[in-house]
């Protein structure tokens, strides 16, 4: 019990914003140890809605993020981001024609299902302090148990 209180939590996925990486009703183990978010991390954010959000960190402090309106892809520091987990185009929504510079203590997050995600395109940058933790492992459903990160 102490392990789950101080080191990790179990969280459920509610919705399709991280599809196909995470599906509605997946159960995840969330590490709640203090850490510095990195690009590609899947994190749980608590602040912007009644329920916590599960999103992928796309940009970190010092990065410049833009959404290429012609290719419908994300650019980090001018370079197209390799996102093998994306299966739909990335539309700029509220970021059309904008470049976002990420200051210290903030991150830029997106859902993997970009057409159905409330994320930094609409709610802005996320304070690192609003990140509850990093998702590290899927425990349900049993046929998808294991790492939620693609092997490189």
Regions from the PLM with identified roles:
Residues 1-3:
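Single-pass alpha-helical transmembrane signal-anchor segments
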Residues 6-12, 19-152:
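Soluble "head" domains of membrane/secretory-pathway proteins
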